[in-house]
């Protein structure tokens, strides 16, 4: 690992991450209970993430399916902490491959895909590969990197169906999760009451938090530019989530994706999208379907929606160990009355 990358990662661990939030995850200990400072091994991979982030969930699930030990560094990205806005963390992401490859974020579409949104240096997750010195900051790219770099564990990206799997991964990656989280259904808010209560004004709080960090960017034009782009994005988001036509379009797109998924499941000869082989596509859909369920949008496939294949598929996904450990049972996940039945069966 390059000394520069090591320094950047260490500064985030030491200056941003709370000691109790820096842990070691291993195949035989998949909950964040072993403090990093008490661990006897230095992991190759180090993940900076947040419990509730769908992008973080995809990467955690991939790491668990591959059966590797990794360092877990949890940031609190909600106001008022907004630890992901700290200069040390933003500088780490600005040194990533995604920062060099993608245009800066400057709009809001309701998705979290870098391909559609542009690169946002103030979000999670970020993966550091201590062996190669590479910094990766786009969840889809991180998962593909792990699939290609690691031969052990589940073969999530089989060579003979690689392109077909990638097509499904891309579809799941374009789901407008962010819009459905921050914005209400104009025809009746389906989100958990606890979430409804904290959402009004949240983008203004995020913008204020960014502005409080701007003085810390003095003498660092790249960091200052990152903060400025973030403000533009959050201003656009604040307008988007109260725009009824845009919200209806986002909800309609999400439901259509589930309809298309049901069609694709009908072509499979096994329990997963590609027969008996559990792939990265299934993992990405697990994250999407669980978020829909959590938010109250399970009507996309239940309650007379006529999509029994998706309903059965979702049940299988939610029972998979990596999905339970990386998403459903990860400590600190916000509560929702829509998933109590899954937690009670854990």
Curated annotation (Swiss-Prot):
The keyword Transferase applies. Residues 189-335 form the GST C-terminal domain. Keywords: Aromatic hydrocarbons catabolism, Detoxification, Plasmid, Transferase. SUPFAM superfamilies: GST C-terminal domain-like (SSF47616), Thioredoxin-like (SSF52833). Gene3D superfamilies: 1.20.1050.10, Glutaredoxin. Induction: By 2,5-dichlorohydroquinone. Pathway: Xenobiotic degradation; gamma-hexachlorocyclohexane degradation. Pfam families: GST_C_2, GST_N_2. GO terms for molecular function: transferase activity. GO terms for biological process: catabolic process; mitochondrial fission; mitochondrial fusion; protein targeting to mitochondrion; response to toxic substance. Its EC number is 2.5.1.-. It catalyses: 2,5-dichlorohydroquinone + 2 glutathione = chlorohydroquinone + glutathione disulfide + chloride + H(+); chlorohydroquinone + 2 glutathione = hydroquinone + glutathione disulfide + chloride + H(+). It comes from the Bacteria. Residues 43-154 form the GST N-terminal domain. InterPro entries: Glutathione-S-Trfase_C-like, Glutathione-S-Trfase_C_sf, Glutathione_S-Trfase_N, Thioredoxin-like_sf. It is an enzyme of class 2 (transferase). Belongs to the GST superfamily. Catalyzes the degradation of 2,5-dichlorohydroquinone (2,5-DCHQ) into hydroquinone (HQ) via chlorohydroquinone (CHQ). Is involved in the degradation pathway that allows S.japonicum UT26 to grow on gamma-hexachlorocyclohexane (gamma-HCH or lindane) as the sole source of carbon and energy. However, the conversion of CHQ to HQ by LinD seems not to be essential for this degradation pathway, because the conversion rate of CHQ to HQ is much lower than that of 2,5-DCHQ to CHQ. CHQ is more efficiently degraded by LinE in strain UT26. The mechanism of this reaction probably involves a glutathione transfer: the halogen is firstly removed through substitution with glutathione, which is then removed by displacement of the aromatic moiety by a second glutathione molecule, producing oxidized glutathione (GS-SG). This is 2,5-dichlorohydroquinone reductive dechlorinase. It comes from Sphingobium indicum (strain DSM 16413 / CCM 7287 / MTCC 6362 / UT26 / NBRC 101211 / UT26S) (Sphingobium japonicum). The gene is linD.
């Amino acid at each position: 690992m390059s000394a520069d990358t090591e320094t950047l990662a260490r500064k985030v661990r030491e200056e941003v991450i709370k000691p109790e939030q820096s842990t070691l995850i291993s195949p035989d200990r998949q909950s964040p209970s072993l403090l990093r400072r008490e661990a006897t091994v230095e992991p190759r991979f180090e993940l900076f993430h947040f419990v509730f982030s769908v992008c973080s969930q995809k990467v955690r699930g991939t790491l668990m399916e591959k059966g590797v030990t990794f360092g877990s560094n949890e940031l609190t990205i909600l106001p008022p902490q907004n630890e992901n806005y700290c200069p040390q963390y933003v500088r780490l992401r600005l040194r990533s491959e995604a920062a060099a490859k993608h245009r800066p974020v400057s709009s809001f579409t309701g998705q979290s895909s870098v391909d559609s949104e542009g690169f946002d240096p103030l979000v999670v997750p970020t993966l550091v590969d201590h062996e190669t010195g590479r910094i990766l900051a786009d969840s889809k790219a991180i998962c593909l990197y792990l699939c290609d770099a690691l031969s052990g564990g589940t073969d999530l990206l089989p060579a003979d169906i690689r392109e077909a799997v990638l097509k499904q991964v891309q579809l799941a990656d374009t789901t407008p999760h962010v819009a459905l989280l921050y914005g209400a259904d104009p025809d009746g808010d389906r989100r958990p009451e606890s979430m409804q209560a904290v959402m009004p004004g949240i983008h203004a709080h995020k913008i204020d938090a960014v502005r409080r960090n701007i003085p810390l960017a003095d003498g660092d034009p790249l960091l200052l530019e990152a903060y400025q782009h973030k403000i533009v994005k959050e201003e656009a988001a604040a307008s988007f989530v109260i725009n009824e036509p845009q919200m209806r379009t986002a909800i309609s797109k999400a439901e259509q994706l589930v309809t298309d998924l049901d069609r694709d499941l009908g072509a499979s000869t096994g329990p997963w999208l590609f027969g008996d082989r559990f792939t990265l596509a299934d993992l990405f859909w697990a994250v999407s379907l669980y978020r829909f369920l959590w938010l109250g949008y399970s009507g996309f496939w239940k309650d007379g929606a006529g999509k029994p294949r998706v309903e059965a598929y979702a049940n299988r996904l939610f029972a998979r160990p990596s999905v339970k450990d990386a998403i459903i049972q990860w400590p600190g996940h916000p509560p929702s009355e829509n998933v109590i039945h899954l937690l009670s069966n854990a």
